[in-house]
Amino acid sequence: MERAVDIVEKLKGGEIKPAELVEECLEKIERLNPKINAFVTLNEKAIEEAKKADVSTPLAGLPIAIKDNVETRGIRTTYCSKFYENYVPEEDAVLVERLKKAGAVIIGKTNMPEFGLIAYTDNPMFGPTRNPWDLSRTVGGSSGGSAAAVAAGILPVASGNDGGGSIRIPASFCGLYGLKPSFGRVPCYPSLPIFIGLHSEGFLTRYVEDTALMLDLVKGWDIRDVKSLPDEEFSYLKAIEEHPDGVRIAFSPDLGYAIVDPEVEEKVREAAFKLEKFGEVEEVKLSLPNLEQELVTKVVLEVVTFIGDRMAEWEKVAFPPYLGFMALAQSLTFREYIKIEERKMELWKALRGIFEEYDYLITPTVACKPFEIGKLGPEEIAGKAITPIGWMPFTYPFNFTGQPAASIPAGFSKEGLPIGMQIVGKPYDDVGVLKVSKAFQDVSPWQDRYPEL
């Protein structure tokens, strides 16, 4: 699969036609989706829209997949929940609106866990999404369908969003690039009242340049999202042409609390020190507060509040593992919800010291390799018992702080499974994270390696 930036140039130059490209994508979906289960709804008008595409626009008819919790006018948007089984929005999300204005053709909607609540892509409506690198293993989540579609080579770009790791975890498990932009960088409207203050819109791509291209087209303030940030009046895509120089990078294998698969740790350590070409890399010992319980408390209470008096109805159709969350909600109080803000400040106080001394922080993206479908996660890592979400300890801290953070492929395990490295920037330094990512991509390319399907 070529870079989206190159495909766009071919579309503009007439070397390929948008309708031909869309037809090729649909053929791949027909052939590969029965194996990986990435798509849950297709846009029946995609070919018709591609024939009308304006090749003078920035995307010139490029096909893009949209995660099924991002609303698409006239295309079913289910949130992968029985509650929304037949919901067809009357307006586009801001993200989709901007993509269409830029000339994108929406090819369809991608699979995810119900309401995007967990980092494992499965639900009662559509079933699990399978990892193209090993069909017996998970893609993670919650942007799992999008990651599978791009990893399988169906198309170069798919949308995702990230409230606790939901772009970065699938990127790690599927061997892709996935940036969680700064909170507010891309307007988020409309959205469910879940992961409030944590949620960022973004993309899954094979190339850093393609993520930069897409963000150039969708970033910037919108009156419908009061927390959206003003646009930065420069191009990310042009900015990453220049490698960083003289940067100071801290590498932490565990943030001070994580239990990590030794193979994951070693691969990420090797990858991190490849960045010494662009500055100084130092392994550091951290002792950050772990906000795992705060994440669980926040999500559970927000979901219970959102479902409200339809709880009995939802319990009959919900993804079975969610029923445990509902039981947990009975023991939680909104006092605990409010105290999350205190813990966020504790976390940032600890991180502030790191980012006063270093420009970037590198960690593993996930503490383990992709695990088998049918499990919500491993029960232990390196022979040590972990909590139910102890396998994903590196991503959610930076949802609480709102910092930009990306997963980029660090290498592959002995079994041939992707392993991701997380690059975290200072608040609002999205362009810096993209620059470091592009620099790493240039010294450690991975894009020519594809799964066999």
UniProtKB/Swiss-Prot annotation:
Which reactions are catalysed by this chain? a monocarboxylic acid amide + H2O = a monocarboxylate + NH4(+)
- What keywords would UniProt list here? Hydrolase
State the source organism's domain of life: Archaea
* Top-rank EC class of the record's enzyme: hydrolase
Gene3D superfamilies associated with the record = Amidase signature (AS) domain (3.90.1300.10)
The molecule here is called: Putative amidase AF_1954
> Which SUPFAM superfamilies does this UniProt record tie to the protein?
Amidase signature (AS) enzymes (SSF75304)
- Indicate the residues that form the catalytic site: K67, S142, S166
Query: Can you tell me where the transmembrane regions are?
Result: none
Question: What family is it from?
Answer: Belongs to the amidase family.
Q: According to the UniProt entry, what is the EC number of this protein?
A: 3.5.1.4
Q: Name one GO molecular function term.
A: amidase activity
